Amino acid sequence: MKKFLLFPLLYLMNISAIAEMHKVSDSGEILALDSEAWSCVLDDSKSLVWEVKSAEEGVQYSLNTYTWFDGESGRDNGTFSKNCYWGRNCNTLSFTADINKSNLCGYSDWRLPSLDELNTIVDYYGESDTLIDTAFFPHTQRNTYWTSDSVTNNPKLAFEVPFFYGG
C-alpha cells in the first residue's frame, strides 16, 4: 500500500531499509549524492520519500506559507495566509492537490506527514540552525511545518514541528 505526504510532502514506500538518504529527480530517478538539482529525498531507513522545497517561485517555493486544512477542519480559505504561489486557497489541502497534479518525483498521492514521521527528519545535532540535514533539504526555512495529526481535544487545530531551536 502506497501513501504520500508533504514536507513536507512524503511518499511511503514498501522497500527494504538500508539507512541511507538519496536524492531523487522530479521524474523519480535516484540521483548521485553530489547531484546539484533534485526534487525529493528518499529515506531508506524509514521507507519515506520527502518533498524538497525550492529556491524558485512556484508550488514548492520555500517561502510559501499555508494554513492547515484537511477538508473538514482548519481554514479552507487560507484566511491567515495569502503567501503561496497561486495567491488563493493557501492551505495544506490545496497545496497537496497541486503537488499531486504535478506528479512530483513520479508520484501522485502525496499527503501531509504524521507528527511521528515528520520528527524523523529533525536533526538536533547538525551544523545548521535549521534543524534538518541541509545537504538534502537546503531550502528548508527555520519555521514550523504542518503535520496531518489534529489536536485530540480540538480537531480544528493540527500539530506543527519546529525546525529551529526554541520552537
Region spans (language model):
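Sec-dependent N-terminal signal peptides
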Residues: 4-13
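Glycine-aromatic-enriched surface loops/turns that form tight recognition elements
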Residues: 17-111, 115-167
